[in-house]
Amino acid sequence: MTDLTSLTLAEARKGLADKTFTSLELTDAHLKAIEAARALNAFVMETPDQARAMARDADARIGKGEGGPLAGIPLGIKDLFATKDVRTTACSKILGNFVPTYESTVTAQLWRDGAVMLGKLNNDEFAMGSSNETSCFGPVGNPWRREGSNTTLVPGGSSGGSASAVAALLCMGATATDTGGSIRQPAAFTATVGIKPTYGRCSRWGIVAFASSLDQAGPIARTTRDAAILLRSMAGHDPKDTTSVDIPVPDYEAAIGKSVKGMKIGIPKEYRLDGMPAEIEKLWSEGAAWLKAAGAELVEVSLPHTKYALPAYYIVAPAEASSNLARYDGVRYGLRVPGKSIGELYENTRAEGFGAEVRRRVMIGTYVLSAGYYDAYYIRAQKVRTLIKRDFEDCFAKGVSAILTPATPSAAFGVGEKGGADPVEMYLNDIFTVTVNMAGLPGIAVPAGKDSQGLPLGLQLIGRPFDEETLFSLGEVIEQAAGRFTPVRWW
């Protein structure tokens, strides 16, 4: 029998339906893989007993012909999603050993459809980071290494545990979240597929908040088909989330293999950065050529406010974060560090509970929201955001179906290599992805090639609001042309 962990989610679904193997066998194979891959530090909480119980239940349901769309499929869950009776910390000391008494809407829908939970996945603290180095559980290792090198690389962030676990074949797919690129950048760094759906497509209820107007849940998977299968279960209207949009969820899987003939693909001239590596430029041209060969039409488009996106994002996101993170005060749950007064208790708890990057962003956010600077920074950033959104609207109004860009400005870098002295160096990782969150649009990252050192590189497709289907169709064209890449096992 093939090693069960090497199957795609779609292949595993067929094997379970055909009774070639059971969910318990599939789950056990992944639990063994997780145990053998602890050096990657992808999981911060393993739930083997719960996983086996869920797998047995799935097998019973499949036996009766009552299995749901994800019956028996073992998944990893980012530690930002509340999981009932299972520790959820957002990878921050301040949440301590917090155990939710409720389930996030997205994970509840996965369990409704029969999925199995293998455990909780590592991420940057409160999803603030682009390398998964800010987690209180320590950094995550990327399953990929440079050819001939033993240097451990970052998997990207903030959903680094999700991307690493999927790439290392520790789970068949994973939940993730994306505020400025936290699904797409790790996917590009690990040769996995990651989609950030349109804002409002997936419920945010029960997900630890970072920046509420930007956060969106989505899947990281091995293939575009697998990502489409997962997104169908994760998406849907939720009355508990006022930003959730009440529109039907299409069958995303049906978009896989659909013709892209006649589609107009925008190539934005503003994404050609000064000093952009030749490998990224070449990859972008190759991706465009593949789409053209499949019958799509390439058109140059302009997104003139792109250059303001990153500074505007790093005002809006910290501003919302400083407000959202005010609730962690040591009074109701999580860490409490005593003080002589209530004010001192707050100060001590937050100083000890938050890591350096979270403290930095809370300070930036508080500063830009303060009386003297609110108009100069926050209001101006919101105006820029409106202009960015308008750029995309103008582009789509001209008949463009999707926009093709690089996913990241480079391949994965070494743990500890960036952002030590200058956080802006780390923030520049989000240069191609933040515009999508600022405009609330869907974006997918698909593996498209490797750099000269054998590291994966990804391309990004940006779609019209609620048109994730087109992204899956186009993404699959790139996937078929580029082929699939798997890392050489070192862990």
Curated annotation (Swiss-Prot):
Record field: catalytic activity: L-glutamyl-tRNA(Gln) + L-glutamine + ATP + H2O = L-glutaminyl-tRNA(Gln) + L-glutamate + ADP + phosphate + H(+)
Domain of life according to the entry: Bacteria
Matching Pfam families: Amidase (PF01425)
Molecular function per GO: ATP binding; glutaminyl-tRNA synthase (glutamine-hydrolyzing) activity
Family to which this protein belongs: Belongs to the amidase family. GatA subfamily.
Its job: Allows the formation of correctly charged Gln-tRNA(Gln) through the transamidation of misacylated Glu-tRNA(Gln) in organisms which lack glutaminyl-tRNA synthetase. The reaction takes place in the presence of glutamine and ATP through an activated gamma-phospho-Glu-tRNA(Gln).
Record protein name field: Glutamyl-tRNA(Gln) amidotransferase subunit A
Lineage: Bacteria, Pseudomonadati, Pseudomonadota, Alphaproteobacteria, Hyphomicrobiales
